[in-house]
């Protein structure tokens, strides 16, 4: 039977626990999360176990990536269920700090990332977001000092931002993107899916179907503008309010206009009722 994970809530406790792991010459993988864990998160843990001998999962709802009008206060917090799931997966250490531990009084430092963070996608609608993400992930990398860190590809722009930050700051952390995990009907798993009404939940998979159809059109040789128009019409006809639906270079997130531009990623964000969903697919 697997040993239950150590739970650290203070920096001294985290350092002691990490010291115990490192004394065994362990390689360490970090899986940063905000809790409300689902099978998508657990797939990251399983990948982490394949990439390192010890796995640390952080559970922290990061206030600096939420704007005042967003859902920080109502974001699902399910600590007991999360801890049980992580124990069942054989996680070695859970880092569960509070806000005062991560951002003590007088905290005044922020990491800002250009390039993919200002690609005109999420940053247009959530200009605060990537500075908050880069700052908290930078702190987690310094606190845990992992060899590898696992992030889901559903938040594709975030993955690119974190990868750039990790490289630019010489963290020594290898950032690995894991495949998006989907429900049987194609909806990308997300902690925010719980906000959907039963009726909206039936409509939500249209987002993925529209992206697949757009990718099909692109592969058939149609222009990016024409292909995206087809997908956008599918999305809005289903009742979504579209924030963006774009074809970008998969590595740089630069706008593209043909398949010859390099590897392509379709990225979308749209609101269904009060719930904002994001997703992406490779072409």
Curated annotation (Swiss-Prot):
Residues annotated to bind beta-alanine: 65
EC primary class: ligase
UniProt: (R)-pantoate binding residues: 65, 158
Annotated GO biological process: pantothenate biosynthetic process
Enzyme Commission number(s) of this protein: 6.3.2.1
Keyword match Metal-binding: no
UniProt-annotated binding residues for ATP: 34-41, 152-155, 181, 189-192
Locations listed in the record: Cytoplasm
Protein's pathway: Cofactor biosynthesis; (R)-pantothenate biosynthesis; (R)-pantothenate from (R)-pantoate and beta-alanine: step 1/1
GO cellular component: cytosol
Catalytic activity field: (R)-pantoate + beta-alanine + ATP = (R)-pantothenate + AMP + diphosphate + H(+)
Single GO term (MF): ATP binding
Catalytic site positions: 41 (proton donor)
Swiss-Prot/TrEMBL keywords: ATP-binding, Cytoplasm, Ligase, Nucleotide-binding, Pantothenate biosynthesis
Statement: the UniProt record of this protein carries the keyword ATP-binding: yes
PANTHER family to which the protein is assigned, alphabetical: CYTIDYLATE KINASE/PANTOATE-BETA-ALANINE LIGASE (PTHR21299), PANTOATE--BETA-ALANINE LIGASE (PTHR21299:SF1)
Family stated for the protein in its record: Belongs to the pantothenate synthetase family.
Free-text function comment from the UniProt entry: Catalyzes the condensation of pantoate with beta-alanine in an ATP-dependent reaction via a pantoyl-adenylate intermediate.
Complex and partners: Homodimer.
Further information: The reaction proceeds by a bi uni uni bi ping pong mechanism.
NCBIfam families: panC
Protein's name in the database: Pantothenate synthetase
Organism classification: Bacteria, Pseudomonadati, Pseudomonadota, Alphaproteobacteria, Hyphomicrobiales
Gene that specifies this protein: panC
